[in-house]
């Protein structure tokens, strides 16, 4: 609790384009096979994507693959501008002149090879580090990228919390996004298949993969939200019980409800982020903050949980 940091500003963005149903093609046999396996593992019969840069002139079966990557890069710029402008002027000037670190996150690590007709100039922006954002925030200290699949954002938050509590930096900026590349989305699901028992879904029989980008500015300065990252817990739920707090009024999670219920001895309100908002890879946990602002919650504590493939979980708490 003493190491808790404050989320001074956040911005999230998703495409304005509609959802497109994925349709397998014989031109890409491996992708079609992965799609079939993913549907079986998730007990669904279809998969819809919402992506930045969908092209009106693309062939129907290729519309979710042949997207314009520049729309994704542009969205990163926009959320960074919004997050910066949301700060009070004094804080904004302080950020530009203080010790500031920049962390870039995404779900896949090196995924530019899956982009349609990408230039060498923009390849490093997606795969390595968006230098335009580093310049925007006038960062001349530490910059890095975390490639932790769906855990990337929480790993970046843990690093940010350490930086701030050790007084190494005054501000830590975390920017990143999720590219809903069909083949990677299918194979990621196949790593951790769901149980055979079907679970109720908001849209029965359909998986939703929605691209989102986000920018989050953390500091020790008091903000609207206070955030504290907890430790990792293995499948032994007794360890988790020692860190459970009675003032938690809402538990948001990304994954199967059955994978987290063994960790709770007392009834608690659950929010399935993927069911409510669609899956956005490493950005999904940040949707719990969106939920707080969307419903104008005040005076409570929320725990956001991300189960892993081995029966364990990572989490962070948010006071609002």
Language-model regions, residue ranges each:
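Active-site histidine-anchored catalytic micro-motif
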Residues: 155
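Conserved "HGTGT" condensation-loop signature of ketosynthase/thiolase-family condensing enzymes
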Residues: 1-150, 162-168, 177-181, 189-320
């Amino acid at each position: 609790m003493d190491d808790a940091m404050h989320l001074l500003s956040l911005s999230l963005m998703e495409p304005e384009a509609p959802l497109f149903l994925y349709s397998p093609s014989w031109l890409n046999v491996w992708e079609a096979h992965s799609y079939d396996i993913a549907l079986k593992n998730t007990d669904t019969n279809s998969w819809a994507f919402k992506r930045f840069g969908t092209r009106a002139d693309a062939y129907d079966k290729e519309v979710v693959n042949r997207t314009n990557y520049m729309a994704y890069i542009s969205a990163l710029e926009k959320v960074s501008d919004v997050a910066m402008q949301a700060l009070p002027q004094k804080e904004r000037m302080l950020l530009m002149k203080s010790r500031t670190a920049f962390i870039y996150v995404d779900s896949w690590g090196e995924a530019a090879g899956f982009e349609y007709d990408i230039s060498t100039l923009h390849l490093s922006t997606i795969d390595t580090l968006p230098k335009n954002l580093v310049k925007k925030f006038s960062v001349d200290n530490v910059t890095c990228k975390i490639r932790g699949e769906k855990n990337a954002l929480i790993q970046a938050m843990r690093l940010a919390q350490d930086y701030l509590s050790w007084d190494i930096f005054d501000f830590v900026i975390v920017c990143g996004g999720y590219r809903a590349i069909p083949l990677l989305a299918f194979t990621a699901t196949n790593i951790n298949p769901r149980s055979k028992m079907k679970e109720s879904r908001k849209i029965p029989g359909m998986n939703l993969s929605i691209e989102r980008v986000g920018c989050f500015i953390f500091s020790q300065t008091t903000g609207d939200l206070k955030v504290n990252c907890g430790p990792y817990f293995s499948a032994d739920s007794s360890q988790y019980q020692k860190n459970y707090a009675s003032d938690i009024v809402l538990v948001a999670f990304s994954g199967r409800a059955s994978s987290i219920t063994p960790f709770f001895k007392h009834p608690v309100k659950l929010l399935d982020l993927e069911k409510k908002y669609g899956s956005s890879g490493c950005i999904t946990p940040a949707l719990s903050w969106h939920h707080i602002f969307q419903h104008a919650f005040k005076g409570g504590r929320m725990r956001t949980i991300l189960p892993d493939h081995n029966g364990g979980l990572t989490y962070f708490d948010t006071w609002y």
